[in-house]
């Protein structure tokens, strides 16, 4: 982490620094990964000045520029893996849900997307010995699906699984939930999440998981018809990159749930497709397709990953949480 303050950056005085902080740019790292247009609008300065400030921040934070592959490999060792709680699922994911990446869960209603999100919110708070990341959780809830009672059930399930005394109240205190009422509010909440994550990091409770459940609900409701598609995708693209930036800044896993649609011209194979188009497809690091099976079983397919082969895992969603089948 950089030791210099915003005010020490060339071109940033006390007034500009205050505007940046009000907009959520509290650290050198946050400025370093911003775009010139974004910074110019926020601080009411010219784009050329904003570009100089960003370049100075990148040098101070040692962000940007070319690196050799071995250095990237060394830095990749900082990436954490959050256990899913299921051995087969973890193996398919190369050890668990990665930090500094967006993992998309898509599937039809009742396929278990929200259940997985709840389970990850519990697992991430466990110590590394038990597959967790010792972290806090931020949830952006767009469909009013967060249920604290479900968290308590899952904590009880982990208590029985590991033979430990775990307090559901403590787990709930480390989960910070905000309800998003429209797409603008949803995007704004990512900025608010950045402020909260900075505060929690200073308190020794780093955020290691950001959940958006569900990603596309408001965008689908507000942007209807082909005429609005370009505007929707542009706005969605900005939102997805804001989520990616959050994951990088805080070494956190970003998990988004997504709705599906049926592709009417698909005569062969599964017609189910995730909504959000190429914007979501290109920005999500890992794409997981959830399908219902018999009873409480769910089939999870790894559809896309930069480093892992396609594969399937079968899990069970029980009262105690996710388990191997």
From Swiss-Prot:
The keyword Disulfide bond does not apply. InterPro entries: AAA+_ATPase (IPR003593), DNA_recomb/repair_Rad51_C (IPR013632), DNA_recomb/repair_RadA (IPR011938), DNA_recomb/repair_RecA-like (IPR016467), DNA_repair_Rad51/TF_NusA_a-hlx (IPR010995), Hlx-hairpin-Hlx_DNA-bd_motif (IPR003583), P-loop_NTPase (IPR027417), RecA_ATP-bd (IPR020588). The keyword Nucleotide-binding applies. GO terms for biological process: DNA recombination; DNA repair. SMART domains: AAA, HhH1. PROSITE patterns: RECA_2, RECA_3. It comes from the Archaea. Pfam families: HHH_5 (PF14520), Rad51 (PF08423). ATP binds at residues 107-114. Keywords: ATP-binding, DNA damage, DNA recombination, DNA-binding, Nucleotide-binding. Coiled coil: none annotated. One of its GO terms (molecular function) is ATP hydrolysis activity. Belongs to the eukaryotic RecA-like protein family. Involved in DNA repair and in homologous recombination. Binds and assemble on single-stranded DNA to form a nucleoprotein filament. Hydrolyzes ATP in a ssDNA-dependent manner and promotes DNA strand exchange between homologous DNA molecules. This is DNA repair and recombination protein RadA. It comes from Methanosarcina barkeri (strain Fusaro / DSM 804).
């Amino acid at each position: 982490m950089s030791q210099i303050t915003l005010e020490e950056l060339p071109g940033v005085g006390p007034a500009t620094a205050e505007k940046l902080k009000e907009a959520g740019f509290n650290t050198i790292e946050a400025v370093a990964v911003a775009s010139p247009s974004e910074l110019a609008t926020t601080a009411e300065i010219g784009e050329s000045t904003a570009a100089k400030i960003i370049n100075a921040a990148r040098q101070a934070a040692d962000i940007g520029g070319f690196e050799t592959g071995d250095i990237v490999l060394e830095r990749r060792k900082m990436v954490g893996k959050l256990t899913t709680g299921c051995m087969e699922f973890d193996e398919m994911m190369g050890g668990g849900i990665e930090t500094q990446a967006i993992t998309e869960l898509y599937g039809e209603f009742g396929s278990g997307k929200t259940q997985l999100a709840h389970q990850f919110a519990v697992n991430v708070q466990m110590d590394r010995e038990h597959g967790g990341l010792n972290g806090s959780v931020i949830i952006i809830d767009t469909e009013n699906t967060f249920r604290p009672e479900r968290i308590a059930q899952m904590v009880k399930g982990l208590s029985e699984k590991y033979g430990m005394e775990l307090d559901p109240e403590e787990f709930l205190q480390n989960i910070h939930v905000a309800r998003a009422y429209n797409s603008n509010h949803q995007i704004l909440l990512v900025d608010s999440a950045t402020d909260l994550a900075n505060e929690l990091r200073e308190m020794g409770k780093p955020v290691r998981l950001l959940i958006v459940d569900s990603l596309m609900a408001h965008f689908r409701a507000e942007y209807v018809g082909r005429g609005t598609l370009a505007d929707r995708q542009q706005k969605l693209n900005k939102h997805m990159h804001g989520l990616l930036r959050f994951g990088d800044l805080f070494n956190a896993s970003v998990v988004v749930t997504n709705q599906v649609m049926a592709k009417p011209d698909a005569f062969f194979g599964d017609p189910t497709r995730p909504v959000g188009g190429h914007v979501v497809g290109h920005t999500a690091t890992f794409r997981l397709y959830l399908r219902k099976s018999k009873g409480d079983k769910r089939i999870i397919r790894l559809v896309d990953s930069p480093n892992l082969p396609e594969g399937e895992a079968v899990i069970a969603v029980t009262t105690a949480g996710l388990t191997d089948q």
